[in-house]
Amino acid sequence: MSLSRLSSPQTFSRVFIVARGAATGHAVAPSSDNSIGYFEKIAYRFKGIPLPTETEAPKSMFDACNKEWSAPELLPSVPKDFKEHPDRDLTNYPYPSRPMYPPKTRLLMMPDSWFTAFQKVTGTSGPYLFFGGLFAFLVNKELWVFEEQGHMTVGWILFYLLVSRTAGYKIDAGLYKDYQERVGFFKGLIQEDLKEAVDFRKTSAAQTASFAALKEGMPTSLKDSMQLQLEAAYRKNVQTISNEIKRRIEYLKETEETKARFERDQLLKLINDSVEKQVSQKDFQEKFLQNAIQQLKGIAV
């Protein structure tokens, strides 16, 4: 039972008779929401047509159907004047280039170059007749034997066509985006290396300039340094001599003071010993007593 039996003929005509490319053109539904049937709303939803109550067109899963993807920027090629060695023969042995698109084919898998060789002699239909006859001959003579599941090849071909026409555009765009990200990553590494090389070159240039300035001012700087060293050595020697003279003067002063003190002590000791020796004699004591008695007598008179 088809869906057309559930809707009126007018609704059926509006649902299934739609111009090609309506999904990508974002057509507008009729202004009256009541005139849109249930199945027609489903059809508009699948085709990406906004309803009167919607301000923006919904994102449809069939927007990318039957679209041919083309790269906004081709793959980078090797420069013509690039050689990794001067002896490299670029004429006979050029660098291999990575094609952006696969080579042109016919019947999904046969190279176009096989057909163009026949067209010069047999015309446009000649290659198809030749390969068709060759295929029929191989199958008829059982030189090319199909397996029991050989008929499933038709299903795989249909599946390939379905996937390539529905999701092929998004797959190609995603792969190209991943490729650009990968190339950007490697370019970032190259830029970092170049930045390090530039920084190293700048640092080397600054060091070279500083060495040149140092070389130019080396005699003057050496002379100034020598004068400073001589002055420092002179001040050090003067300070050493001053300390040594001060130490020797203090030593001589202490020596003289010690010598004078020793002589004074010895002299006092000698005097004391002499006095004590004289006082201890009896004659001296008798003379001293007589002298004292006479003085007392003189005082009494």
From Swiss-Prot:
Q: Which GO terms describe its molecular function?
A: proton transmembrane transporter activity
Q: Which GO terms describe its cellular component?
A: mitochondrial inner membrane; mitochondrion; non-motile cilium; proton-transporting ATP synthase complex
Tell me the PANTHER family matching this sequence: ATP SYNTHASE F(0) COMPLEX SUBUNIT B1, MITOCHONDRIAL, MITOCHONDRIAL ATP SYNTHASE B CHAIN
Query: What keyword terms does UniProt attach to this protein?
Result: CF(0), Hydrogen ion transport, Ion transport, Membrane, Mitochondrion, Mitochondrion inner membrane, Transit peptide, Transport
The entry's function note states: Mitochondrial membrane ATP synthase (F(1)F(0) ATP synthase or Complex V) produces ATP from ADP in the presence of a proton gradient across the membrane which is generated by electron transport complexes of the respiratory chain. F-type ATPases consist of two structural domains, F(1) - containing the extramembraneous catalytic core, and F(0) - containing the membrane proton channel, linked together by a central stalk and a peripheral stalk. During catalysis, ATP synthesis in the catalytic domain of F(1) is coupled via a rotary mechanism of the central stalk subunits to proton translocation.
Q: Where in the cell is it found?
A: Mitochondrion; Mitochondrion inner membrane
Its quaternary organisation is:
Subunit of the F-type ATPase which has 2 components, CF(1) - the catalytic core - and CF(0) - the membrane proton channel.
Q: Which GO terms describe its biological process?
A: proton motive force-driven ATP synthesis
Q: Which domain of life is it from?
A: Eukaryota
The annotated consequence of gene deletion is: RNAi-mediated knockdown results in sterility. RNAi-mediated knockdown does not affect the timing of hypodermal and vulval development.
Boundaries of the annotated transit peptide in chain numbering: 1-21
Family, according to the entry, reads as follows:
Belongs to the eukaryotic ATPase B chain family.
Q: Can you say what this protein is called?
A: ATP synthase F(0) complex subunit B1, mitochondrial
